[in-house]
From Swiss-Prot:
InterPro entries named among the record's database cross-references: Cry1Ac-like_dom-VII, Cry_V, Galactose-bd-like_sf, Pest_crys, Pest_crys_Cry1Aa_dom-IV, Pest_crys_dom-III, Pest_crys_dom_I, Pest_crys_N_sf
PANTHER family from the UniProt entry: ENDOTOXIN_N DOMAIN-CONTAINING PROTEIN-RELATED, PESTICIDAL CRYSTAL PROTEIN N-TERMINAL DOMAIN-CONTAINING PROTEIN
SUPFAM superfamilies assigned to the protein according to its UniProt record, in alphabetical order: delta-Endotoxin (insectocide), middle domain, delta-Endotoxin (insectocide), N-terminal domain, Galactose-binding domain-like
Entry's family note: Belongs to the delta endotoxin family.
Designated name of the protein: Pesticidal crystal protein Cry1Ja
Organism per entry: Bacillus thuringiensis
Misc. comment: Toxic segment of the protein is located in the N-terminus.
Length: 1167
């Protein structure tokens, strides 16, 4: 039975896609194809990435002046059709309307830019271009959320990336030309910082949205795989390829023409899928198709392919192939791939060899043998391979049997339709695999050239997958989506790869190398050329282990030392060292021309300008007020980095001027030891601080010492650093300023205290280095910081002054805080306290170049305000003194009442723990014992407070000494107690109490006593529910007594004055109890319950009294705190006991309900 081949070979896509029709081999498409528009834009960005009117006009011509609303709608429809999701009408209309509005506004901006470009000194033209920039910038910032509406992120993605690209291009214009337009330096720097943030934000959104949808689509069936692969291919062309170029908008990193390359591969569907009906076959699994897609690899180029032929019922088809390829910079068959498919012999093999720029187009003839004919065969029965050749038309081709009608240009259109396809094509064939006998074609973008050519007039970006030799330990892994291709990875020290490069310029030309990388560790990179070492330097960690590879985790860093090539064709090698068991990823290598002479001249001019800007006049008699100590250090770095060869005399002169500036800065600084030579070394001067602060030597940020303040686990014990400015250094009625440089900080609190506290919480996000992403973490020959690489310069416009009383989020790392001084009094010596404090676990800070200096005399309103504040402070001080006299008298009486006499070495007989806490509470009512802002700094009442606190400490010690029962207040959990059954220690009204919840539970302690002596057993407890709670004291033979507690009758509260006077020396040698002593004779009946809920607390809870200052509950925390009175229901009972042996047992239990014990005391009677 004959097959009707004419009907059988109708391509599937001709029937399923009404927008594409093949007539006699020609494609008829809509007016605008989103793929063609995106590829055309991509070609423009790759070849014309130079800012200015030409670039702006190109964007207008390619996108923003060319697309009508109906054509923007095709961008949305493209993805809608792929993922079978319709955008809501309102969302669609809003997106298209806003895209149209952006296009109109961009055209107006383009007109304004061209006007200014033709007359750059015209003030009206400057004003117009600034206005149009700000309008358009605001519109994009306002409208771009409309292109990522939740639920529609995927179908909106291709227009989102167009809006993002427009925005980054606009921001780049303002960064490059903004100051010439009239924008301030601060404004330009703010825009630049925002641009860098949005490069990462836009990139991450596109990649995350793409990956999420790709994972959702899946590829288990062949129908799913076709959609999956088409989505992958088309969004690579319309979204990811454009995203890969976003970093090039960083004009400070790429100030000149930059050439990028896209090394990713895209795949067209197996030829058999274009056959009608086959797509619905359930016999082909999508997973098997995906397995034929190449895994990550070093980039190679198609060299040749041998095609084998088999037949089925006299119909010939392509059944197998063998391929060869070559690496970048080489030619010929360097790599041979194994046979794919079968080596059929129905016809002689056909060899297809690459010509010139490779195969740009394939016309395939699908083949299908139906099941009723026997064996099912899906494949191709004919192919035509067209080669790209710019100077020959029509281009050469190779035909396998006969051409087909399935055109690869339908799936991967040309990038330039103004020329014939062989000249305007966007991709070349890179590899062929097969699923069964159905060929699968892999394609690479033409920007990835077959050689790594270095241009002396441009920045050349070369992905490291274009290497020809991968070293052991290095692997090629799938790119994260925003790199334009796959990347290399190492987890230990070694070489990544060798790359062949071709030099087109003179060999005298010098270059600097940069690396775009991501790393979980600090490390060293090294480079070699033809085996000779060229560069080595330290580079910083960019991410934490386990983090996803996001845009912000990649850094472009370079070596400061330029080099030149000795051969026109050379081998470049990159490796890493000084790390292990971490992850390092390499995206690309960049070769940047180094213009040495120009740099030296520019550096000298910049240094001269910076030095002169330090002084008030040309004779260098005084520093400008706004010149900071940090700025002087940075200017010093500029001078030190000048070339000795080019400008040695000028360098020496400038160095002397900077040293003079530094001496003037030191002279006006009222801080002692501003360079942090020591902390806590001198008791009455210099810096005082917590022991966890570290002083570190200069780094790439600080030229001199700086301090690091870590976080703390308890806000009552903060990390702190402080110093007092003596009254003798201050002038009356003058404003003073504290300022400095913060490398990074979180929750850093800064205080200036005189009459009251000036307070700011400063958060400065750190970059990890002052040096931009374009350089490595610099080191010199001896390991010192190499401050001569390009870095972020100090700019006074970026200074952030915290004077508004609000939390200050600095745009720069400079901070300042001022305070006004009224009348000065050397006797009172009020001075000014300078305090830095961190009281959170996540807090931290690194700061240096601190200054406290006179700012200006107070006049007018400021003078009146400080006089009013001073009077208010003195009135409060008088009131405080009056209150203190009263509170001190009451507290002193309470403390004295605890003791027998003024020797304070014996407690009164009736003194109990509650009385001591009550006295301690009265002592804590004394205000201003310490500064509320930092409780280690003594206040005006520190002397009397510490006097009474010392007596309270003595009282606690005497009380603990006379109670023979260890841990009788359960503040140390169940330590020293034996437990049987389940009991618990709970916090009840800030007290640690023993809870016995079950009648079978018991708690006991063995106690050593002196036989024949008398003891008082005193228990404070509370009974809940029915039954009785019992505390029993007994000896091994007999002599048992007990205290019972019940909730069924009104209990009498026993006084605590039973017994004689108790001394501080009860329990003499031989009668003292050892806590680790256990019950003898009862050890089988009791066991230590290691699973009981034990909460080891400090001896006394730390709480803020309600009647002291409430702005700091840790203000008077000196180890003792509030102990609240006994809650209602607690009863204190006691009994007298006379032991006959040297050991007694205290047992606690109950008969029913719950028994709660606050404390158990066993006190020796006085003889």
């Amino acid at each position: 039975m004959e097959i009707n081949n004419q009907k059988q070979c109708i391509p599937y896509n001709c029937l399923s896609n009404p927008e594409e029709v093949l007539l006699d081999g020609e494609r008829i498409l809509p007016d605008i194809d989103p793929l063609e528009v995106s590829l055309s834009l991509l070609q423009f960005l790759l070849n014309n990435f130079v800012p200015g009117g030409g670039f702006i006009s190109g964007l207008v011509d390619k996108i923003w002046g060319a697309l009508r609303p109906s054509e923007w709608d095709l961008f949305l429809a493209q993805i809608e059709r792929l993922i079978d999701q319709r955008i809501e009408a309102t969302v669609r209309a809003k997106a298209i309307t806003e895209l149209e509005g952006l296009g109109r506004n961009y055209q107006i901006y383009a007109e304004a830019f061209k006007e200014w470009e033709s007359d750059p000194d015209n003030e009206a033209a400057k004003s117009r271009v600034i206005d149009r920039f700000r309008i358009l910038d605001g519109l994009i910032e306002a409208n771009i959320p409309s292109f990522r509406i939740i639920g529609f992120e995927v179908p909106l993605l291709s227009v989102y990336v167009q809006a993002a690209n427009l925005h980054l291009a606009l921001l780049r214009d303002s960064v490059i030309f903004g100051e010439r337009w009239g924008l301030t330096t601060k404004n330009v720097n703010d825009i630049y910082n925002r641009q860098i943030r949005e490069i990462h934000e836009y990139s991450n959104h596109c990649v995350d949205t793409y990956n999420t949808e790709l994972e959702r689509l899946g590829f288990r069936s062949i129908a799913q795989w076709r959609i999956y692969n088409q989505f992958r291919r088309e969004l690579t062309l319309t979204v990811l390829d454009i995203v890969a170029l976003f970093p090039n908008y960083d004009s400070r990193l790429y100030p000149i023409q930059t050439f990028s390359q896209l090394t990713r591969e895209i795949v067209t569907s197996p030829v058999s899928e274009f056959y009608y009906g086959v797509i619905n076959s359930g016999n082909i699994i999508g997973t098997l198709t995906e397995q034929q897609i190449r895994r990550p690899h070093l980039m190679d180029f198609f060299n040749s392919m041998i095609m084998y032929t088999s037949d089925n019922r006299r119909e010939h088809y392509w059944s197998g192939l063998e391929m060869t390829a070559y690496f970048t910079g080489f030619a010929g068959a360097q790599v041979s791939f194994p046979l794919v498919g079968t080596r059929g012999e129905s016809a002689p093999p056909l060899t297809v060899r690459s010509v010139n720029d490779g195969i740009y187009r394939i016309l395939s003839a699908p083949f299908y043998s139906a099941p009723f004919l026997g064996t099912i065969v899906l494949g191709s029965r004919g192919e035509k391979f067209d080669f790209a050749l710019n100077n020959i038309s029509p281009p050469p081709s190779t035909i396998y049997r006969h051409p087909g009608t399935v055109d690869s240009l339908v799936s991967i259109p040309p990038q330039d339709n103004s020329v014939p396809p062989h000249r305007g094509s966007s991709h070349r064939l890179s590899h062929v695999t097969m699923r069964a006998s159905s060929p699968i074609f892999h394609w690479t973008h033409r920007s990835a050239t077959t050689t790594n050519t270095i241009n002396p007039n441009a920045i050349i970006q070369i992905p490291l997958v274009k290497a020809f030799n991968l070293h052991s330990g290095a692997t090629v892994v799938r790119g994260p989506g925003f790199t334009g291709g796959d990347i290399l990875r190492r987890t230990n020290t070694g070489t990544f790869a060798d790359m062949r490069v071709n030099i087109t310029g003179p060999l005298s030309q010098r270059y600097r190398v940069r690396i775009r990388y991501a790393s979980t560790t600090d490390l060293q990179f090294f480079t070699r050329i033809n085996g000779t070492s060229v560069n080595q330097g330290n580079f910083q960690r960019t991410m934490n282990r386990g983090d996803n590879l996001e845009s912000g985790n990649f850094r472009t860093a370079g070596f400061s030392t330029p080099f030149s090539f000795s051969n026109a064709q050379s081998t470049f090698t990159l490796g890493t060292q000084a790390f292990s068991n971490q992850e390092v990823y390499i995206d690309r290598i960049e070769f940047v021309p180094a213009e040495v002479t120009f740099e030296a001249e520019s550096d000298l001019e910049r240094a001269q300008k910076a030095v002169n800007a330090l002084f008030t006049s040309t004779n260098q008699l005084g520093l400008k007020t706004d010149v900071t100590d940090y700025q002087i250090d940075q200017v010093s770095n500029l001078v030190e980095c000048l070339s000795d060869e080019f400008c040695l005399d000028e360098k020496r002169e400038l160095s002397e001027k900077v040293k003079h500036a530094k001496r003037l800065s030191d002279k006006r600084n009222l801080l002692q030891d501003p360079n942090f030579t020591s902390i806590n070394r001198q008791l009455d001067r210099g810096w005082r601080g917590s022991t966890d602060i570290t002083i570190q030597g200069g780094n790439d940020v600080f030229k001199e010492n700086y301090v690091t303040l870590p976080g703390t686990f308890d806000e009552c014990y903060p990390t702190y650093l402080y110093q007092k400015i003596d009254e003798s250094k201050l002038k009356a009625y003058t404003r003073y300023e504290l300022r400095g440089y913060i490398e990074d900080s979180q929750d850093l609190e800064v205080y200036l205290i005189r009459y009251n506290a000036k307070h700011e919480t400063v958060n400065v996000p750190g970059t990890g280095s002052l040096w931009p992403l374009s350089v490595e973490s610099p080191i010199g020959r001896c390991g010192e910081p190499n401050r001569c690489v390009p870095h972020i310069e100090w700019n006074p416009d970026l200074d952030c002054s915290c004077r508004d009383g609000e939390k200050c989020a600095h745009h720069s790392h400079h901070f300042s805080l001022d305070i006004d001084v009224g009348c000065t009094d050397l006797n009172e010596d009020l001075g000014v306290w300078v305090i830095f404090k961190i009281k959170t676990q996540d807090g931290h800070a690194r700061l240096g170049n601190l200054e406290f200096l006179e700012e200006k005399p107070l006049l007018g309103e400021a003078l009146a305000r400080v006089k009013r504040a001073e009077k208010k402070w003195r009135d409060k001080r008088e009131q405080l003194q009056f209150e203190t006299n009263i509170v001190y008298k009451e507290a002193k009486e309470s403390v004295d009442a605890l003791f027998v006499d003024s020797h304070y070495n014996r407690l009164q007989a009736d003194t109990n723990i509650t009385m001591i806490h009550a006295a301690d509470k009265r002592v804590h009512r004394i205000r201003e014992a310490y500064l509320p802002e930092l409780s280690v700094i003594p206040g005006v009442n520190a002397d009397i407070f510490e006097e009474l606190e010392g007596l309270i400490f003595t009282a606690f010690s005497l009380y603990d000494a006379r109670n023979i029962i260890k841990n009788g207040d359960f503040n140390n959990g169940l330590s020293c107690w034996n437990v049987k059954g389940h009991v618990d220690i709970q916090q009840n009204d800030h007290r640690s109490v023993l809870v016995v919840p079950e009648w079978e539970s018991e708690v006991s302690q063995e106690v050593r006593v002196c036989p024949g002596r008398g003891y008082i057993l005193r228990v404070t407890a509370y009974k809940e529910g029915y039954g009785e709670g019992c505390v029993t004291i007994h000896e091994i033979e007999d002599n048992t007594d007990e205290l019972k507690f019940s909730n069924c009758i009104e209990e009498e509260v026993y006084p605590t004055d039973t017994g004689n006077d108790y001394t501080a020396h009860q329990g003499t040698t031989g009668c003292a109890d050892a806590c680790n002593s256990r019950n003898v004779g009862y050890e089988d009946g009791y066991e230590i319950n290691t699973t009981a809920s034990v909460n080891y607390k400090p001896t006394y809870e730390e709480e803020m009294y309600t009647d002291v200052r409430r702005d700091n509950h840790c203000e008077y925390d000196r180890g003792y705190g509030n102990h609240t009175p006994l809650p209602a229901g607690y009863v204190t009972k006691e009994l007298e006991y006379f032991p006959e042996t040297d050991t007694v047992w205290i047992e606690i239990g109950e008969t029913e309900g719950t028994f709660i014990v606050d404390s158990v005391e066993l006190l020796l009677m006085e003889e």
